[in-house]
Regions:
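Alpha-helical transmembrane segments of multipass membrane proteins
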Residues: 65-66, 87-91, 107-111
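Membrane-interface helix caps and helix-loop-helix hairpins in membrane proteins
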Residues: 91-100
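Structural signal for the C-terminal ends of transmembrane alpha-helices
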Residues: 69-71, 112-117
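Aromatic-anchored segments of alpha-helical transmembrane domains
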Residues: 16-17, 83-92
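Interfacial segments of alpha-helical transmembrane regions
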Residues: 1-14, 75-83
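Membrane-embedded alpha-helical segments of multi-pass membrane proteins
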Residues: 59, 100-107
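Short, charged juxtamembrane terminal tails flanking transmembrane helices
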Residues: 119-126
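Core segments of alpha-helical transmembrane spans in multipass integral membrane proteins
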Residues: 14-18, 22-23, 35-68, 81
């Protein structure tokens, strides 16, 4: 895998680790409420759901990192597709900006990763 693809996959993994931290530990702070567009009342009512969502974002992050470090190409692709689908769903159910924040980086990482993998496979042996 090329360096650019690795950096992009790591970025997506770190982004989801950040979502875990915000949703599990800082959901009721004014910064996170403003970032996610929720009122203090809604944040108080939805804290357990946000924590659950944060946990799933953590699974995406860990899955991507595990796949990278164990060189599991198909698993990298699987987790990136999961992130893309989650972002598309979020765009329809929450707000369109979710697609930009979540799906676009994963889509860029996936395309770069697949192009990088295809170049590596087609590279002549030395």
């Amino acid at each position: 895998m090329g360096a650019t693809a690795k950096v992009l996959v790591i970025f997506v993994a770190l982004e989801h680790l950040g979502f875990l931290v915000m949703e599990m530990f800082y959901w009721q702070t004014s910064f996170v409420q403003k970032l996610f567009g929720v009122s203090p009342e809604l944040a108080a009512e939805s804290g357990f759901m946000a924590a659950n969502q944060g946990l799933y974002n953590g699974f995406l992050s860990i899955g991507l990192m595990w796949a990278l470090f164990t060189h599991k190409k198909d698993v990298v692709v699987f987790f990136l597709i999961c992130v893309i689908v989650a972002g598309i769903f979020g765009a329809f159910t929450v707000k369109p900006g979710v697609f930009v924040a979540q799906s676009c980086p994963a889509l860029l990482a996936l395309v770069t990763y697949l192009l990088s993998a295809s170049r590596m496979e087609n590279k002549p042996a030395s």
